[in-house]
Amino acid sequence: MRCTRAIRQTARTGWLTWLAILAVTAPVTSPAWADDPPATVYRYDSRPPEDVFQNGFTAWGNNDNVLEHLTGRSCQVGSSNSAFVSTSSSRRYTEVYLEHRMQEAVEAERAGRGTGHFIGYIYEVRADNNFYGAASSYFEYVDTYGDNAGRILAGALATYQSEYLAHRRIPPENIRRVTRVYHNGITGETTTTEYPNARYVSQQTRANPNPYTSRRSVASIVGTLVRMAPVTGACMARQAESPEAMAAWSERAGEAMVLVYYESIAYSF
């Protein structure tokens, strides 16, 4: 597995070499796509449309620090007080993440720890002015507070990140439809069904072209985990997984990813 070997080799030769390469090659300004915010974003969730179409999505709490959200500190495995709901402008990434969760169910059944059945949902959401680009918001944070360690990887993050942060809530009226994916652990068959949301309100809107300006973190942010591919942050991804596990997931999905790991705060809890 190329990604896994690369990670292990990086650990042996020193991650500072990788950081030096990124510091030289990362763009010094935000990329052109940052000026063209998406009209549609996607979210993986385990909750059924009977709940989501009625209630929408609500953030954990009121912590609007972008860096703490992206590193997972304010998410479920941390303090569970993030003021953001994670979405992705990449449907493919969301599908890859769902496939990963489905594979987990299959492997658990093989190990005698489950039935192998799996149900997951991909929600298609109309973005509006309440959605902010994670990359541009990260740039804004670094520029405002002068986090030099973060600045080294800011260009790489801005280039490859596809997360959009909904502040506080995504109302049902913004949720266009859902794709339900069911894997039968007995037959091995996977079926996909799409359901429209009767409460959806069609409008011509896009995500906010401006970054979200957040307060400064009171925590000691010593590092982050950057995945060099379209990804979402730790609040949707599984930051508790090791880099090796995430590399294996990437290769199973057929997407070559380069993982750069430097003292991730996600592993400090």
Curated annotation (Swiss-Prot):
SUPFAM superfamilies: ADP-ribosylation. One of its GO terms (cellular component) is extracellular region. Residues 1-34 form the signal peptide. GO terms for molecular function: NAD+ poly-ADP-ribosyltransferase activity. Keywords: Signal. Transmembrane segments: none annotated. InterPro entries: Borpert_toxA. Pfam families: Pertussis_S1. Belongs to the bacterial exotoxin subunit A family. This is Pertussis toxin subunit 1 homolog. It comes from Bordetella bronchiseptica (strain ATCC BAA-588 / NCTC 13252 / RB50) (Alcaligenes bronchisepticus). The lineage of its organism: Bacteria, Pseudomonadati, Pseudomonadota, Betaproteobacteria, Burkholderiales. The gene is ptxA.
